[in-house]
Each structure stands twice: as C-alpha cells, then as structure tokens.
C-alpha cells in the first residue's frame, strides 16, 4: 500500500512538471537572431519566431526575416504562415494558439522550445499565459527569458547601416512585388515602419533622403518604446543582457542552470 501511494505521488509530481521554454527577446537590431542560432545548436533547440510581421509570406527583407542559410539547419516555426494577399492581420491570440501547439510538439520530440523575436506582446502572452475575454491568465510553462538591451550608442549606427543594407538588398523591389501580387497598400501601411515608408516612397510621397531620415528616426522611436515595454517584464524569469561581447557566454550559463534545475 505504501508503495502504491509513493507511486501515485511520483506520477502526480511528473504530471505537474511544466515544460521549460527559453525566450530570446530584446530591442530591434540587438542581435537576437545570431545569438539564438548559436544557443539552439548548443542546446538542441527548435526556434519559434515571435515577430508580428515575419508570419507573412514574402515580407522578408523589410521584416529582417532569417534566411535559410542563416538558420544553419535549425528548425524554425511561425514563419511564412499567412498569405498577405488575404488582408488578414495575425493577432496575439493567433500567435499564442500556434505557439502553444508548436511548443508542445517540440517538447514531445525531446528538444528545447525557444521563442525568438521582438514582438513583446507575443512572447509575454505565452510566458504569462494570457487569458482572453473573461479567461484568467494561466501560465503553462516554466520560463527563462533572456532580453537583449544594448545601449543606444551601440544600436544607433547598426540601425542606420541596416537600413541602407536592406534597401541595397532589394527592400523596395520586395514591396513593389507585394503590391503587384495584390497585397493592399493599406495592409502594408498598417504594418508600420519599413513597409509604410516603402509604400510612401514608391508612391512618390517622399524622396530617398527623406525616406532614410524618417526610417531612422521612426525606428529609434520604436526601439525606445520597446525598451519601456521590456523593462516591465516579469523579474522572476527575465535576465537583461547589455554587452554584446558577453551575450553568448552569459546566455549559455543561464540556460544551462535553467535546464538542470
């Protein structure tokens, strides 16, 4: 009888164990993608993109979507899952539903689910188990969040350079192709930042110098809002990294400690 009780207690404990997930979040141009690939290779992880624009097919350059070569064989999820010609916005509830399903599938394969992206509402909806409507929050997972927050003096030149590189790599042509495929200009406008300004430039509303100036300043304003958001993350599971030179070593140590506890 005593053995049966002990077994019941053991299996009840197992049933109550929560799946562990790692979140790599942070401001725009902070280095999330490169860090996540190195960490995924180390910890046998699969990556779930947590970016509100990378879910759309064809929005590649303007959303800074990871390329197949950059993935280095690491499986990625929640990319290119919505046809933008349908003019359908993908909500935080949609993301949470898809993330839950994908996390459980990754965990069932014996791998580490890793959410990566700068859409803070997406990652928080999963970490905190947001309830919608009258539903209370119901956190499903044990969470470690590593949030990249390098200082402005490091980010500003990266933003300026990144903007020029993306235009050189065909960002205007990408937007022109999306419009030609039937993606409404109003839909791209709603996506903000690059795509809104791309449409304005292609329609002749602004010239190239104005485009670059507005894109830089609007991106920096967006990053400022991201910083405000991320400073309010749950301190119980969030660690802030500010020095890119120590990202990998510090994140590796944090994840090792998290996975073995």
PLM ranges: what are they?
Residues 51, 79, 118, 170, ...:
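Residue-level signal for inorganic ion chemistry
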Residues 33-114, 124-135:
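N-terminal phosphate/diphosphate-binding loop that engages ATP/GTP or pyrophosphate donors
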Residues 53-54, 120-121, 196:
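Alpha-helix/helix-capping structural signal
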Residues 2, 14-15:
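Acidic, Ala/Val/Gly-enriched low-complexity intrinsically disordered segments
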């Amino acid at each position: 009888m005593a053995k049966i009780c002990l077994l019941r207690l053991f299996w009840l404990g197992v049933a109550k164990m929560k799946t562990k997930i790692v979140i790599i979040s942070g401001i725009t141009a902070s280095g999330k993608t490169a860090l996540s690939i190195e960490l995924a290779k180390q910890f046998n992880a699969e990556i779930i993109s947590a970016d509100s624009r990378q879910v759309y097919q064809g929005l590649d350059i303007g959303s800074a979507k990871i390329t197949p070569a950059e993935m280095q064989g690491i499986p990625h999820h929640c990319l290119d899952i919505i046809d933008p010609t349908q003019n359908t916005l993908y909500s935080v509830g949609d993301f949470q539903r898809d993330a839950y399903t994908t996390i459980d599938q990754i965990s069932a394969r014996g791998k580490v689910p890793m959410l990566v992206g700068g859409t803070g509402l997406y990652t928080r909806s999963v970490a905190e188990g947001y309830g919608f409507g009258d539903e209370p929050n119901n956190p499903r997972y044990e969470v470690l969040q590593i949030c990249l927050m390098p200082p402005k003096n490091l980010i500003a030149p990266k933003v300026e350079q990144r903007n020029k590189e993306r235009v050189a790599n065909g960002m205007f042509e990408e937007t022109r192709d999306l419009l030609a495929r039937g993606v409404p200009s109003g839909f791209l406008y709603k996506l903000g930042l690059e795509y809104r300004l791309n449409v304005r430039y292609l329609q002749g509303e602004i010239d190239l110098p104005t485009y670059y100036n507005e894109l830089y300043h609007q991106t920096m304003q967006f990053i400022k809002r991201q910083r405000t958001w991320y400073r309010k993350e749950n301190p119980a599971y969030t660690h802030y990294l500010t020095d890119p030179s120590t990202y990998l070593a510090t994140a590796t140590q944090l994840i090792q400690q998290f996975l073995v506890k």
